[in-house]
């Protein structure tokens, strides 16, 4: 029985106000990301100061983090799609190298990527 094979991919983490959650998830759908995870009501401190979670209020009033694992060739279209949002509103995107064992769950990279 052989071991698992790992395949290089990119992990995207986008932190935005909850009111922009749909913008980000629709963009991920548009670029054919195979899926994403949303973590709501997050707290933290950044360029615009301290952001506190609002567990008792609307999720649109708090920060959310949307995470996805995609082939490297999808990073630039995601960044391009987020550019108009980040020009008007606060938010941040992190990109990390990751390795996945089930590449078929995340989409394959195209040749040359």
Language model features: what each stretch is:
Residues 1-113:
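Positively charged, small/polar-rich N-terminal and surface patches that mediate targeting and assembly
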């Amino acid at each position: 029985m052989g071991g698992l094979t790992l395949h290089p991919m990119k992990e995207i983490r986008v932190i935005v106000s909850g009111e922009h959650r749909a913008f980000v998830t629709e963009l991920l759908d548009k670029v054919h990301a195979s899926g994403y995870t949303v973590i709501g009501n997050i707290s933290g401190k950044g360029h615009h100061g301290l952001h506190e979670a609002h567990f008792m209020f609307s999720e649109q009033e708090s920060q959310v983090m949307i995470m996805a694992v995609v082939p490297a060739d999808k990073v630039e279209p995601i960044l391009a799609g987020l550019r108009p949002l980040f020009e008007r509103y606060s938010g941040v995107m992190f990109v990390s190298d990751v390795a996945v064992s089930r590449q078929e769950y995340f989409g394959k990279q195209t040749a040359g990527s």
